[in-house]
C-alpha cells in the first residue's frame, strides 16, 4: 500500500490487488458498506503512518475508485467529532457479475461527484504540453513540436445508441489495447473517447483501427471538449479496459 497527501483534508491510499487478497477483501466487498469493509479500513488506517492532522481528526469519509491493477481510496476528513463514517463509498462499483443495466445505474449513481480526484488523462497531458509550447517556443519551433505530438497520437470520439451497443463494442474488441479512453453520457446517447499511440505502428494502423471501431460504434456528432463541458462523465480513465474485463450476466 502507498499513501499520498492530496491536500490538508484529503489522502489518497493506493491498494494493490495483492494487498486486498492479503486482507481477505474483494472488489465486491466495497459495493455495500458492511462490517467487513469497516474493519478493513480500520486496519489500513492502523498500518499506515498517517499525517498528524489526520490522527484523531473526527469523522472520515471514504471514496473508493477501481483501477486496472489497484484500488484507490480517497480519505477526506471533516471537523465533526464523530466516529468514522463508512457510508460514503459513492465511487465504487462491483464491475463483475452485474447486468449491463445494473452496471450503468451504478456508474450514473456513483460517478457524478469526482471532487478532488486527480485526472491523469493522456489527452490532457498533451493539451498541457501544447500550452507550454505556446509559452516557451518560437513560431517555427512550435510548429515542429505540435506536429510531433499529433503524429505520435490520434484520438476518436465514438457514439452508441444504447448501453447494449457499448457492451457489444467492448466484447468485440477484447484484444484491442488503447492508450486512453473515457466514457460519457449525453441525453440518451453514450460516447467513448479513444486515444491511440501511433509512434511504433505502421502508417495504415490508425485507419484500420477506426474501421474496426465503426464495426460496433457510430460516428460521433460531438467533440471531446463539448462532452467535457456538457456531458456526464461515467468513467474518467481506462473505460475500455474496464468494460473489456467485465463479465456481463
UniProtKB/Swiss-Prot annotation:
One of its GO terms (molecular function) is protein-macromolecule adaptor activity. It comes from the Bacteria. One of its GO terms (biological process) is negative regulation of DNA-templated transcription. It holds the Pfam family MecA. The N-terminal domain probably binds unfolded/aggregated proteins; the C-terminal domain interacts with ClpC. Enables the recognition and targeting of unfolded and aggregated proteins to the ClpC protease or to other proteins involved in proteolysis. NCBIfam families: PRK02315.1-4. Homodimer. Belongs to the MecA family. This is Adapter protein MecA. It comes from Streptococcus thermophilus (strain ATCC BAA-250 / LMG 18311).
Amino acid at each position: 500500500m502507498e499513501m499520498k497527501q492530496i491536500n490538508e483534508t484529503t489522502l489518497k491510499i493506493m491498494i494493490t490487488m495483492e494487498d486486498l487478497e492479503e486482507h481477505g477483501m474483494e472488489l465486491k466487498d466495497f459495493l455495500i458498506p458492511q462490517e467487513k469493509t469497516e474493519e478493513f479500513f480500520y486496519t489500513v488506517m492502523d498500518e499506515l503512518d498517517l499525517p498528524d492532522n489526520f490522527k484523531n481528526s473526527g469523522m472520515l469519509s471514504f471514496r473508493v475508485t477501481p483501477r486496472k491493477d489497484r484500488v484507490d481510496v480517497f480519505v477526506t476528513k471533516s471537523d465533526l467529532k464523530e466516529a468514522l463514517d463508512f457510508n460514503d463509498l459513492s465511487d465504487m462499483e462491483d464491475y463483475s457479475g452485474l447486468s449491463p443495466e445494473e452496471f450503468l445505474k451504478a456508474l450514473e449513481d456513483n460517478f457524478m461527484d469526482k471532487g478532488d480526484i486527480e485526472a491523469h488523462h493522456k489527452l490532457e497531458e498533451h493539451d498541457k504540453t501544447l500550452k507550454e509550447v505556446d509559452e516557451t517556443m518560437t513560431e517555427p519551433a512550435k510548429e515542429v513540436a505540435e506536429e510531433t505530438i499529433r503524429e505520435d497520437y490520434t484520438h476518436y470520439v465514438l457514439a452508441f445508441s444504447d448501453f447494449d451497443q457499448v457492451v457489444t463494442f467492448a466484447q468485440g474488441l477484447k484484444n484491442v489495447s488503447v492508450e486512453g479512453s473515457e466514457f460519457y453520457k449525453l441525453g440518451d446517447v453514450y460516447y467513448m473517447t479513444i486515444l491511440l499511440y501511433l509512434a511504433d505502428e505502421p502508417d495504415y494502423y490508425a485507419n484500420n483501427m477506426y474501421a474496426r471501431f465503426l464495426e460496433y460504434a457510430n460516428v460521433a456528432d460531438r467533440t471531446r471538449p463539448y462532452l467535457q463541458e456538457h456531458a456526464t462523465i461515467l468513467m474518467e480513465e481506462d473505460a475500455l479496459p474496464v468494460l473489456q474485463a467485465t463479465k456481463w450476466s
